[in-house]
Amino acid sequence: MQRQKIRIRLKGFDHRVLDVSTREIVNTAKRTGAQVLGPIPLPTRLEKFTVLRGPHIDKKSREQFEIRTHKRVLDIVDPTPQTVDALMKLDLAAGVDVEIKL
């Protein structure tokens, strides 16, 4: 018989908020009797933007901005119905994007 697995992928710009949300999910899953694999940190996506500092001339004067997107993956193996209910009721931070695959 094939084991059922829930894969949860979290994305966020602030790694501290992401780690807190990950910890909440892990604690909730373990409390309801499911086995958790992870969290596995995935590579951080670094996006850089270069803009001119002044509006007129001076092409040599530029400024760089960057956005870092941190990612984590959790696998919940053989979840119980209580685990699924608890995860649906879980309220996570606003800066975290959650993607769930069954």
Curated annotation (Swiss-Prot):
HAMAP family xref list: Ribosomal_uS10
The name this protein goes by in its record: Small ribosomal subunit protein uS10
SUPFAM superfamilies: Ribosomal protein S10
GO cellular component, one term: ribosome
Highest taxon of the lineage: Bacteria
Lineage, highest ranks first: Bacteria, Pseudomonadati, Pseudomonadota, Alphaproteobacteria, Hyphomicrobiales
MF terms (GO), sorted A to Z: structural constituent of ribosome; tRNA binding
Pfam families cross-referenced by the UniProt entry: Ribosomal_S10
Keywords: Ribonucleoprotein, Ribosomal protein
Description of how the protein assembles with itself and partners: Part of the 30S ribosomal subunit.
InterPro entries: Ribosomal_uS10 (IPR001848), Ribosomal_uS10_CS (IPR018268), Ribosomal_uS10_dom (IPR027486), Ribosomal_uS10_dom_sf (IPR036838)
Family statement: Belongs to the universal ribosomal protein uS10 family.
GO annotation (BP), single: translation
Function, in words: Involved in the binding of tRNA to the ribosomes.
PROSITE patterns in the record: RIBOSOMAL_S10
NCBIfam families xrefs: PRK00596.1 (NF001861), rpsJ_bact (TIGR01049)
